[in-house]
Amino acid sequence: MKEVSVPAIKRIVLIAHDNRKEDLVNWVKTHREILSKHQLYGTGTTGKLISEETELPVYRFLSGPLGGDQQIGAKIAEGDLDIVIFFWDPLTAQPHDPDVKALLRIAVLYNVPMACNRSTADYMISSPQFTKTYKKILLSYNTKVKKD
């Protein structure tokens, strides 16, 4: 196990499937004051929409189906993102479903909190840990991965 310090100013990635974008934008508007104190990231379309609707700066990766989910997964693996807010659509098949599953796996692997709906996002943002430095524990999977 390894302890990693998560800074008080969080690096938060905001993602939403098409049918959930409006819900995510409304959630960001509700929590604009808190979110304005953190660094925001997003997939291409979602990030642009949030930035336009809230006037918050959002660094944008590619659109999810064009590789944005994979870019975000890489940033999580590199320790460059702290929180994932991903309002995904459970009723619509996505062309990049394997990428979404990989992103979920990487978030769990690196112990990055992920909210997949508004209720979980509300609990997360209202946590006292949200605005403080936080020590997270990373499990060592090196011994679990078979080496060739």
From Swiss-Prot:
Substrate binds at H17, K21, T43, G44, T45, T46, S63, G64, H96. Keywords: Lyase. The keyword Lyase applies. It catalyses: dihydroxyacetone phosphate = methylglyoxal + phosphate. Residues 4-148 form the MGS-like domain. One of its GO terms (biological process) is methylglyoxal biosynthetic process. The active site is at D69. GO terms for molecular function: methylglyoxal synthase activity. It holds the Pfam family MGS. Its EC number is 4.2.3.3. GO terms for cellular component: cytosol. HAMAP family: Methylglyoxal_synth. Catalyzes the formation of methylglyoxal from dihydroxyacetone phosphate. Belongs to the methylglyoxal synthase family. This is Methylglyoxal synthase. It comes from Leptospira interrogans serogroup Icterohaemorrhagiae serovar Lai (strain 56601).
